[in-house]
Amino acid sequence: KFDKLIFPITINPMELLFHEGRLYIAGLDDKAKQLLLFVIDKNLIFTISKSVFNRKKILGNYVKQLSHRFGISSAIDNKVYNIKIEFARGYAESMMNFSWHNSKRWQELPNGNYLLHLHCSIGREMIGWLVLAS
């Protein structure tokens, strides 16, 4: 969480992410090895240093942290859950072609509805998506 960070920080940049029309720089905090994402816009101020880091050494940690997020928002409690959400057939069938999360799995239920299985954290984006879906 950002309240534990002391600015300025050093981020080891891993990649650029395009999410919902915005471009982000994603990487790990040099000290805590925490996943950080910053939107690249006119308000972002950064300094490029000459320091180097071993990308291969931290890639596994980066991929693990990013893969547990539903979207790019931070988890509310830094935990990963097995989430099951039941949707009516019509709604579920319209949602199946979207890429919600890499763990997504749909299961047809005996009543004709579908159960969405996810293995990820709960954050602002998931809560917002569920509110809109209801």
Task: Describe the residue ranges of each PLM region.
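Short, mixed charged/polar active-site loops
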Residues: 5-8, 33-35
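Surface-exposed, charged, gly/pro-rich loop-and-adjacent secondary-structure segments at domain edges
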Residues: 26-125
